[in-house]
């Protein structure tokens, strides 16, 4: 028996020691990666900025230590790092050109692509060259790579060029199968966010607005490619209608979509020739990560660039399956208050990429931006979306800049409550009774539908919220509420259409927004600083262990286009009942 207990004790001690050693090695690995990531890159003369167009492009990408520890490599591209890196490459005499290598590339929006493309066009003004190569070009990757001086395709490659489509998913019939109905109160003919739960197809109003903004985005894409490749817009549309994705590679060259069919090693020879180096010598390559480690000059006064992207929520929301990054009103308001009090910050650029969310949370952020505006200039730079709640928090700014392909507007709100009575009684066999002290004491119970009187109260509440929203827009844009009503009703616009109706002041990217902020603050010399400041590796490690963001990202990658319907259902019980959000997150393919 003694030997038995000794063996058990030895086994337990061995397991504990092994676990302790693994934890120590894990922490040392994290520390090593943190230190190595902070080292400044040394750029050699006659270098090339090499950009791998694969994975997702989002506003910002934080170093993911959980992904690194799992042995995976993140291919995600930060738009912030892309624009900054290309600008640094333009101004660095040691970097002679850019090499783009296209793969499975999925941007979060065409507005992000447009901003990245404009950065490449600006790079070319320096007289430096861009060479692009791809085994396969997704439509977004081709739009971006079309700026290249020379564009090559693998002899067995493909170009995906087919136009744009938006395909919302409708959940009414699926919910009905489990006895669930959605009760809705909304304001706005075009406020179609609830249609996914109450209908089985797009309304005429939503179909009209979706058609309008898809055509607007596509016109910008074809115009850009037409100018770069010297192919008419009409011809590009013919190519899309012909589904040239399945054309023979040599056809792409005949159609002038590419300059040649080459293998990777042959493209490297082209790059070496441009660098004027011998074929046997290696190319000095620099990555966006390398350039991220090179600090910009911090001469002059500071302009803060604050990134707010994701769903707008109030307080801590569940970290798992939460539609990715969140705009937490409590956190954002505190950050904005800090920027307001920071005497070193002379102006603030708010980079907003959001389809909205909680109407209450949007109002809190709106108030804090109004307070900030009293102290220093505020300029909004819109990303892929700044719609509904995203526009709500943009409205008070001194100046609003949007990309032509930004989706914005959607001025309207809705309330949505599930009726689970059918699920409980018909599917699960549950029965409910109630005792109450007052007439409406049981209001909000999901065990039965609302009474007509209860629904009338809710509708009045929604109407009041809609009037508040319009009032905020009217104040910020210096319009009458009648003028706002004419362009509201939940209507979604592209940035270029929003400019025509004065919802935005200027078309362009974040660089224009920064320049405008400097002008409003009367700054001749200035530098920018990005906020929120990325958390240190240990905080990030703890957050990822507690909030399960790592699992969220893995599920997003696994489910692909099915991730959104999954989260729509998952979030029904967690999201605020009163919402100011875009009709749906368009899966633009």
Spans of features found by a protein language model:
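Short, membrane-interfacial amphipathic segments enriched in basic
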Residues: 1-2, 76
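Flexible, low-complexity junctional segments that flank or bridge functional domains
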Residues: 2-48, 59, 96, 122-129, ...
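Cleft-lining beta-strand/loop regions that shape enzyme active-site pockets
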Residues: 40-42, 47-168, 297-423
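Charged, glycine-interspersed solvent-exposed loop segments at helix/strand-loop junctions
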Residues: 172-270, 421-501, 505-506, 511-516, ...
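C-terminal long alpha-helix characteristic of the crotonase
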Residues: 227-228, 259-302, 414, 470-476, ...
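Acidic/polar loop patches that form or flank catalytic/metal-binding clefts of enzymes
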Residues: 278-285, 346, 402-403, 432-436, ...
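Intrinsic disorder and flexible/low-complexity segments
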Residues: 300-303, 307-343, 461, 532-589
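Short glycine/threonine-rich loop-to-helix capping motif typified by GTGT followed
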Residues: 359-364, 497-500, 542-545
């Amino acid at each position: 028996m003694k030997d038995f207990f000794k063996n058990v004790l030895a086994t337990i001690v061995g397991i504990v020691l092994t676990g302790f050693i693994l934890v120590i090695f894990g922490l040392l690995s994290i520390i090593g990666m943190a230190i190595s990531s902070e080292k400044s890159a040394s750029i050699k003369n006659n270098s090339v900025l090499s950009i791998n167009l694969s994975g997702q492009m989002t506003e910002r990408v934080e170093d993911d230590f959980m992904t690194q520890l799992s042995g995976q490599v993140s291919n995600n591209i930060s738009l912030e790092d892309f624009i900054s890196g290309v600008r640094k490459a333009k101004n660095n005499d040691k970097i002679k050109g850019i090499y783009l290598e296209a793969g499975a590339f999925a941007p979060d929006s065409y507005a992000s692509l447009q901003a990245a493309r404009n950065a490449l066009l600006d790079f070319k003004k320096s007289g430096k060259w861009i060479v692009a190569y791809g085994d396969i070009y997704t439509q977004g990757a081709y739009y971006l790579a079309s700026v290249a001086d020379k564009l090559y395709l693998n002899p067995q490659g493909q170009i995906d060029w087919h136009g744009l489509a938006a395909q919302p998913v409708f959940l009414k019939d699926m919910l009905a199968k489990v006895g669930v109905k959605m009760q809705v109160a909304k304001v706005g003919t075009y406020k179609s966010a609830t249609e996914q739960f109450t209908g089985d197809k797009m309304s005429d109003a939503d179909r009209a607005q979706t058609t309008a903004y898809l055509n607007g985005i596509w016109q910008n894409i074809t115009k850009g490619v037409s100018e770069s490749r010297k192919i008419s817009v009409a011809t590009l549309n013919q190519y899309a209608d012909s589904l040239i994705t399945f054309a023979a590679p040599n056809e792409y060259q005949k159609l002038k979509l590419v300059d040649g069919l080459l293998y990777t090693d042959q493209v490297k020879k082209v790059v070496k020739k441009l660098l004027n180096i011998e074929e046997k010598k290696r190319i000095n390559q620099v990555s966006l990560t390398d350039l991220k480690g090179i600090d910009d000059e911090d001469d002059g006064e500071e302009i803060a660039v604050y990134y707010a992207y994701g769903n707008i929520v109030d307080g801590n929301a569940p970290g798992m399956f939460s539609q990715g990054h969140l705009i937490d009103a409590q956190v954002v308001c505190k950050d904005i208050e800090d920027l307001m009090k920071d005497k070193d910050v002379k102006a603030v650029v708010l980079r907003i990429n959001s389809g909205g969310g909680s109407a209450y949370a949007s109002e809190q952020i709106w108030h804090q931006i109004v307070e900030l505006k009293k102290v220093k200039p505020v300029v909004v730079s819109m990303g892929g979306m700044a719609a509904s709640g995203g526009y709500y928090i943009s409205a008070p700014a001194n100046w609003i800049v949007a990309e032509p392909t930004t989706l914005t507007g959607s001025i309207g709100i809705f309330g949505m409550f599930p009726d689970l009575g059918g699920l409980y009684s018909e599917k699960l066999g549950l029965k409910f009774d109630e005792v109450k002290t007052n007439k409406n004491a049981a209001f909000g119970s999901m065990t039965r539908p609302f009474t007509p009187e209860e629904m009338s109260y809710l509708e009045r509440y929604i109407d009041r919220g809609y009037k508040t929203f319009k009032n905020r827009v009217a104040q910020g844009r210096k319009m009458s509420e009648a003028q706002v009503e004419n362009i509201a009703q939940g209507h979604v616009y592209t940035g270029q259409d929003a400019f025509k109706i004065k919802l935005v002041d200027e078309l362009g990217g974040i660089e224009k927004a920064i320049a405008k902020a400097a002008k409003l603050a009367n700054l001749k010399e200035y530098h920018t600083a990005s906020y929120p400041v990325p958390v240190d590796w240990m905080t990030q490690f703890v957050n990822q262990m507690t909030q399960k963001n790592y699992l969220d990202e893995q599920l997003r990658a696994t489910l692909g286009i099915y991730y959104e319907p999954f989260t729509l259902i998952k979030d029904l019980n967690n999201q605020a009942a009163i919402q100011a959000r875009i009709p749906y997150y368009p899966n633009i393919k």
